[in-house]
Amino acid sequence: MSANQQSNSQEVLGEVLGPLSDNERLKRESNLLRGTIEQDLQDRITGGFTADNFQLIRFHGMYQQDDRDIRNERAKQKLEPLHNVMLRARMPGGIITPKQWLAIDKFATEHSLYGSIRLTTRQTFQFHGVLKPNIKLMHQTLNSIGIDSIATAGDVNRNVLCTTNPVESELHQEAYEWAKKISEHLLPKTRAYAEIWLDGEKVESTEEDEPILGKNYLPRKFKTTVVIPPQNDVDVHANDLNFVAIADNGKLVGFNVLVGGGLAMTHCDTSTYPRRADDFGFIPLEKTLDVAAAVVTTQRDWGNRSNRKNAKTKYTLDRVGSDVFKAEVEKRAGVKFEQSRPYEFTERGDRIGWVEGIDGKHHLALFIENGRLLDFPGKPLKTGVAEIAKIHKGDFRMTANQNLIVAGVPKSQKAKIEKIAREHGLMDDGVSEQRKNSMACVAFPTCPLAMAEAERFLPQFVTDVEGILEKHGIPEEDNIILRVTGCPNGCGRAMLAEIGLVGKAPGRYNLHLGGNRGGTRVPKMCKENITDKQILEEIDQLVARWAAEREEGEAFGDFTIRAGIIQEVFVSKRDFHA
């Protein structure tokens, strides 16, 4: 932290960025993320957290929320909103054992308002609707089965994603181990989590407690992935730091490093935009943790702490220059990036159904619409997964597409597990490829940032899109990558879709077109603030043209660019709002 930063303003490379945001004060005064959270837990007058603690609990993996469906009714009754928390677990690579699954299933059933488990685009699970009296129990339950929620939210490195590829089992295992190492290396070192939630022994904090993150932590959230081409299921360009696995004869030899991706933006603020990550080059395995720390510390020191809307790594690269940032990383890591090794992303969806791995084990990928595991009428999905967990000897793998893989199934167990899955609606041969390639964030009723529906909106919207595709004779395999996010923060990753809807107001969305199937192109806004009916009319007209004018094998997103319907985004800062 520079002297100017200490005096409540920030200067980076000679440029004064301005006074520090209030979040910087909050973190600096938090006593390494402790704040007064413990005192707040004892306050039963309110179901929420007050003042700074509302923000600080994010570093412990929680967001304060309320049920927005009943907010107005409670206000009429002179009641405060139904405050509760959403917890996001830390699960690098998304692997969870059957024993762990049964424990989280039990907690969700007995101690959450909604009784559901939500698989998320961060390749983990979320509990929604946990009331204040149950929060400590929640953390202690997770701790008893070897799970925590440290740093899954807040201005830190979040849950590390890893390609869910059980077919290439040896390579996946190597990549997964690196995802875990990176996660551990970049974790906050403060003991605040154990002290508050696990009744751990209190220790005196020291200046050296956060050697990588610093006492003010990062300027903004930071997301990391480990990805195994040709699968881009983690959507590398949605993340700050990506390690692209490079293999030789099936053995991992190093990584290409991609830095500066991110999708969040702010409506009507042209200084914000989604951005693809830059390719810095190749590194050998032994430099992985050094490079991870160097990227994080460079962003820690150079990221914008004055304006949180411009605080992410993508804006730092555009402000100081990608080459300058890269050179600083090389200096800090003691490495010289080599020329990137060749790789290609050809797909990013999950292979739903059974696949056989090279080790002879079988893996069943279950499509979970929007990641919501709940016992719906006629489709007791949550019970079905629990029943599988009772007999399964392998593990479960949550995917960044919000699906669930039953991994490591011996041939002798296949029929039994499939029977359970079908009986509980977890396997349905009638689910279209279009539905499998559509995704939404949570949005209403629990997300406080949601401007429009997403999860509850998507199922019927997909049905309508399916009808349009059928009407124009589009084959099943030529579906469209379709994503909906309830606000411009981008949790639904709509800014890497062929058709992306971004919530603007209740019942209204911005329509973005021009992404591609591999997730390597940012779509651009086509129509602003339109209704779902208007969106479907637009899609109908576009699909009609696509069906009539497409080149052989041409995907929808590629067609919209070639046909001049939308301009391609090459450089986001220049092109996205042009």
From Swiss-Prot:
Q: Which pathway, metabolic or otherwise, does it act in?
A: Sulfur metabolism; hydrogen sulfide biosynthesis; hydrogen sulfide from sulfite (NADPH route): step 1/1
Q: Map out region (Disordered) in residue numbers.
A: 1-20
Protein residues bound to siroheme: 491
Keyword terms of this UniProt record: 4Fe-4S, Amino-acid biosynthesis, Cysteine biosynthesis, Heme, Iron, Iron-sulfur, Metal-binding, NADP, Oxidoreductase
Q: At which positions is [4Fe-4S] cluster bound?
A: 441, 447, 487, 491
A GO BP entry is: cysteine biosynthetic process
* One function term, GO molecular function aspect: 4 iron, 4 sulfur cluster binding
Reaction it catalyzes: hydrogen sulfide + 3 NADP(+) + 3 H2O = sulfite + 3 NADPH + 4 H(+)
- The protein's Enzyme Commission number: 1.8.1.2
Q: Which InterPro entries match?
A: CysI, NiRdtase/SiRdtase_haem-b_fer, Nit/Sulf_reduc_fer-like_dom_sf, NO2/SO3_Rdtase_4Fe4S_dom, NO2/SO3_Rdtase_4Fe4S_prot, NO2/SO3_Rdtase_4Fe4S_sf, NO2/SO3_Rdtase_FeS/sirohaem_BS
Q: What is the UniProt remark on how the cofactor binds and its stoichiometry?
A: Binds 1 siroheme per subunit. Binds 1 [4Fe-4S] cluster per subunit.
Question: Would you indicate the residue range of the signal peptide?
Answer: none
Q: Which cofactor does it need?
A: siroheme; [4Fe-4S] cluster
Query: What is known about what this protein does?
Result: Component of the sulfite reductase complex that catalyzes the 6-electron reduction of sulfite to sulfide. This is one of several activities required for the biosynthesis of L-cysteine from sulfate.
Q: Which family does it belong to?
A: Belongs to the nitrite and sulfite reductase 4Fe-4S domain family.
Instruction: Summarize subunit and interaction data from the UniProt record for this chain.
Output: Alpha(8)-beta(8). The alpha component is a flavoprotein, the beta component is a hemoprotein.
Q: What is this protein called?
A: Sulfite reductase [NADPH] hemoprotein beta-component
Q: Which gene encodes it?
A: cysI
